A protein has these predicted regions:
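Membrane-interface transmembrane helices that cradle and orient dolichyl/undecaprenyl
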Residues: 117, 154-169, 176
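Aromatic- and kink-enriched transmembrane "portal" helix at the membrane-lumen/periplasm boundary
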Residues: 33-36, 77, 91, 95, ...
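Hydrophobic/aromatic-rich transmembrane helices and adjacent perimembrane loops
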Residues: 154, 179, 185-186, 298-309, ...
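Perimembrane helix-loop-helix junctions
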Residues: 5-6, 186-220
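Membrane-proximal lumenal/periplasmic loop motifs of glycosylation machinery
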Residues: 34-44, 58-95
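Signature aromatic-anchored transmembrane alpha helix within multi-pass, membrane-resident enzymes
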Residues: 19-24, 121, 125, 171, ...
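Transmembrane-helix motifs of polytopic, lipid-linked glycan transferases
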Residues: 20, 24, 96-118, 138, ...
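Membrane-lumen/periplasm interface segments of specific transmembrane helices
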Residues: 207-305
């Protein structure tokens, strides 16, 4: 039955509903901590997106891209805005749309593996679980509204599902590329699969893709026009307020390594540094990954399970294709997901010039759905038997490697909720009547959003919202500076928080011409920053 076209496999409606319900419950369970406990994984990057949504519903600004950028389309802010109107402004309501996206991607994968690959819903659940319950590090990123982490996976699924509806396909590609340029990998993979399977070798197939690209270009033109009217650096600003320029195409072009000697180093790091964190096999404290927890992810020797799971699947698919020498429709979606992952890995290596680190994990998350595609492909070409059973046991073991830390994390928050130092900072400032302050980037916007702008903290090292600097300067008589360590004349408010005297920050230089005077890069996040 493996490899048959899905039309020959009439699965029961009950099986579909049960499989879907199980997957949805698993995605919901692994997401609870990161959505409903604000201290779990929250920083200034996420806060800026929340402030964009707040300014939008208040009519104070028209944000188009992430404040301070002319790329990274602010889709997450527009998704959060109606939730803010209904349920109020909070970290949970900011992340709630991303929870829905995670649920939607899981359902799209499950349904497509049944419909296009021909897997039974219960069997298709196993590959989907690689996305449904990834490592806590990946789950945290999938639910972080800081520029589009889960978005490329969503657009990958949507581009495939709308491939025969070129206008919709072009719309999703156009928006997806502007939100996160990694969406390009999905379009390149689709073109490759359509060349291999045949559609792109026909006149109709070429017409569809030309229509797709025409629509995408139309989306880009509309956004380019709207950009002139957008609030690029917060309320009351335009794109002229930025000291640097760029767009998704420029960002993509800048991510190519010019040192070929670094590529072998990158390939090595992909397997010894990136994959162990991405797939949760390396033992690591979650607080090293920016998660407020005393728990850990990974187990000693778990990499063996991952290597066997992926290695057997690759070998099984390769041997089958070598023997059969015929392409079946059931292979196309699996190949598409695998190609997306391979392109993502190549882009990550080239873009980081071989230097891969878990702090840049968000730049390569598509390998998660790549493993889903590889697993489904193996199941599609391997008939029931001992090999299939052994492999499914290994795959289930790999799911347990990531599920156990997720369960431990949830239990930790339910039984003994960790302290919330971010909220404590807000409480200390409010208790002292502090409404205006300077601070570093990684605290400024985080505190301002948590305080619902009752406290305005202007960033003195990397400015995304210009209005805050002007407000603090206008209230310099009552403003202070918040620091992480001792400062002359300062007083400690709590561990890691000093209230310091106001120091005049130099006036912002007038905007430079595009591309002439770049704004300083975002400062590195301090270890264990709160």
């Amino acid at each position: 039955m493996a490899g048959e076209h899905p039309s020959a496999l009439p699965f029961s409606r009950r099986e579909r509903w049960v499989a879907a319900a199980i997957v949805l419950l698993i995605v919901l369970a692994r997401s609870l901590v990161f959505v409903f406990w604000e201290q779990s994984h929250y920083d200034s990057d996420q806060a800026v997106m929340g402030l964009m949504a707040k300014h939008l519903i208040e009519g104070r600004a028209f944000p188009l891209f992430l404040y301070g950028n002319t790329y990274l389309l602010g889709v997450e802010a527009y998704l959060a805005a109606p939730v803010f109107l209904i349920a109020g402004v909070s970290v949970a309501t900011l992340k709630f749309p991303l929870l829905l996206i995670n649920l939607g991607v899981a359902l799209m994968l499950l349904r497509t593996l049944e419909r296009d690959v021909g897997l039974r819903p219960y069997v298709a659940m196993l590959p989907v679980l690689f996305f449904a319950v990834p490592s806590p590090a990946v789950t945290a990123k999938f639910l972080a509204p800081d520029g589009g982490n889960v978005a490329p996976s969503m657009y990958t699924a949507l581009i495939w599902l709308t491939r025969n509806r070129p206008n919709w396909c072009g719309f999703f590609f156009g928006v997806g590329f502007l939100q996160r340029e990694f969406t390009l990998y999905a379009m390149l993979a689709l073109l490759a699969v359509e060349v291999i399977s045949g559609p792109l070798r026909t006149r109709e197939g070429l017409r569809r893709r030309l229509t797709t690209f025409r629509t995408a270009i139309e989306v880009w033109l509309v956004v380019h026009i709207l950009k002139s009217y957008s609030s690029a650096a917060g309320p009351g600003t335009t794109t002229e307020a930025l000291l640097r320029s760029g767009d998704s195409v420029a960002q993509l072009a800048q991510r190519f390594c010019t040192d070929p000697a670094m590529i072998p180093r990158g390939l090595t790091n992909l397997f010894v540094e990136h994959f162990p964190v991405l797939f949760g096999t390396r033992p690591m404290a979650l607080n090293e990954l920016g998660i407020e927890s005393a728990s850990r992810q990974g187990f000693s020797g778990a990499w063996i399970i991952l290597a066997l799971t992926a290695g057997i699947a690759v070998a099984g698919v390769a041997i089958h294709l070598g023997k059969e020498r015929r392409w079946k429709p059931a292979y196309s979606f699996c190949a598409y997901l695998v190609l997306v992952a391979l392109l993502s890995q190549a882009g990550y290596i080239i873009g980081r010039c071989g230097g891969l680190h878990y702090f840049t994990l968000r730049y390569e998350l598509l390998s998660v759905i790549g493993l889903t595609g590889l697993a489904a492909w193996f199941l599609a070409v391997t008939p029931p038997g001992r090999l299939r059973s052994i492999w499914m046991a290994l795959a289930a073991g790999m799911v347990l490697v990531t599920a156990i830390p997720a369960v431990r994390l949830l239990a930790e928050y339910v039984r003994h909720e960790p302290a919330n130092p971010k909220r404590m900072i807000v409480q200390h400032l409010e208790a002292r009547g502090i409404k205006y302050a300077w601070g570093d980037y990684w605290r400024a916007y985080m505190i301002t959003f948590l305080a619902n702008e009752r406290i305005i903290i202007a960033a003195d090292d990397f400015e995304r919202i210009h209005e805050y600097s002007e407000i603090v300067k206008a209230h310099k008589d009552e403003a202070v500076r918040i620091a992480r360590e001792f400062c002359p004349g300062g007083k400690p408010a709590m561990p890691g928080l000093w209230i310091c005297p106001y120091e005049r920050v130099e006036e912002t230089a007038p905007p430079a011409e595009a591309g002439t005077t770049p704004q300083p890069a975002i400062p590195p996040k301090p270890p264990g920053s709160r």
